[in-house]
Amino acid sequence: MSSHILQLPTGKQDFKTIVKDNYYFVDKTKYIKSVFQDDSSQVLLITRPRRFGKTLTMNMFESFLSLNYDDPNDLSEHIELFKDKEIYKEKEFCEKFMGKYPVISITFKDVKALNFKDAYEDLGELICDLSDKFLFLKDSPKLTFNDKKAFAKLNDLDYLQNKRHLNTVKNSLKKFISFLYKHFGQKVILLIDEYDVPLAKASQFNYY
């Protein structure tokens, strides 16, 4: 009799990859329910040492909660990912939460420059890349003309990397949340990973 030994997902932090490629995975999916139903907090800060799986956990949240933007009624990928996981036994919770929310997921791990100028440009690039996920907003009938102009600025790298437009960058996540809420008529979930990296680098290199 032979047994199949699953590979360890060393260095892998993408939930979909781990599940689809059949890597070894400790099922912590019921944590989704404890966070999004059993905990009434509007804001949750997850603090754990490095390499404790925070990024994978947040990626798992995104995979479970996020709408299919091409077809919001299509849950086929969600079902494929979670059908053999513990959370899928929670039928009422899955019906209410799985694939039901617009999700903004952003990581600041690459905003780690040696000076403010470069860090600011990294941040502008990060915001521009994020806007690429939501290009459907450009044609949304729910957004006003001014909303669409504001979104276009969030999709313009040169504009974002110009320090004269600092307020646009500062308010970018607030704008994304507003636009997605208007488009879908649903609360937006914001996931922020590695939020401390820019702060640590700014402190280390004295441009905080």
Q: Which sequence ranges carry the predicted segments?
A:
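A generic secondary-structure signal for well-formed alpha-helical elements
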Residues: 39, 61-72, 127-135, 184, ...
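Loop/turn-to-beta-strand initiation segments
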Residues: 42, 102, 185-189
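Walker A/P-loop-proximal flanking segment of P-loop NTPase domains
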Residues: 2-90
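Alpha-helical scaffold elements adjacent to nucleotide-binding pockets in ATP/GTP-utilizing enzyme cores
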Residues: 34, 52, 56-64, 118-130, ...
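Walker B catalytic acidic pair
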Residues: 193-197
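Conserved helicase/translocase P-loop NTPase motor core
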Residues: 165-187
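Conserved P-loop NTPase mechanochemical-coupling segment
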Residues: 10-19, 111-170, 198-207
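P-loop NTPase motor core
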Residues: 11, 16, 27, 66-136
